[in-house]
């Protein structure tokens, strides 16, 4: 569950742009649950338009990540889709995965990724690497 300011605006991003199917909507609790195959894998909780931004150095969630496939072409298509919607995207090569990052309407960072290989099974330290990725 991540906190957002506005339920409808967040739904428009996560369902409308990222295409996460809605599993349940609870307007009375300002919550929406999204499915990735299970009943609910991800949820938003609206805390109000006046809620302050989380401080970047405070403890808490750094970002959420969603695996979108296995192929680099799937990541390229996701990048094109986000950019066509006016969303700024950063691409990164993590050796074990290839990723793009963007922010939701409330500044929460979202990672979309494809697995690059099984290198992490042989080199666990490879998981912490980051380099620019040209898509």
Predicted regions, residues:
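Vicinal oxygen chelate
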Residues: 4-8, 64-109, 114-120, 128, ...
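Short beta-strand/turn micro-motifs at beta-sheet edges
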Residues: 49-55
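Short, solvent-exposed beta-strand edge segments and adjacent coil->beta transition regions
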Residues: 59-63
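Short, solvent-exposed coil/turn elements at secondary-structure transition points
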Residues: 28, 50, 95-97
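Core segments of cupin and vicinal oxygen chelate
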Residues: 3-47
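Residue-level signature for short turns and capping positions that connect secondary-structure elements
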Residues: 39, 49, 115-117
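Short glycine/proline-enriched turns and hinge-like loops at secondary-structure junctions
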Residues: 27, 56-58
């Amino acid at each position: 569950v991540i906190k957002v300011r506005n339920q409808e605006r967040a739904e428009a991003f996560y369902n409308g742009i990222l295409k996460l199917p809605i599993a349940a909507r609870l307007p009375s609790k300002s919550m929406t649950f999204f499915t990735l195959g299970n009943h609910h894998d991800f949820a938003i909780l609206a805390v109000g338009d006046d809620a302050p931004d989380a401080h970047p150095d405070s403890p808490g969630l750094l970002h959420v990540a969603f695996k979108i496939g296995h192929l680099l072409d799937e990541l390229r298509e996701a990048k094109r889709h986000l950019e066509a919607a006016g969303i700024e995207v950063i691409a990164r090569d993590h050796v074990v995965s290839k990723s793009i990052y963007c922010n939701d309407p409330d500044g929460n960072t979202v990672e979309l990724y494809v697995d690059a290989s099984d290198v992490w099974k042989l080199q666990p330290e490879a998981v912490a690497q980051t380099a620019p990725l040209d898509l």
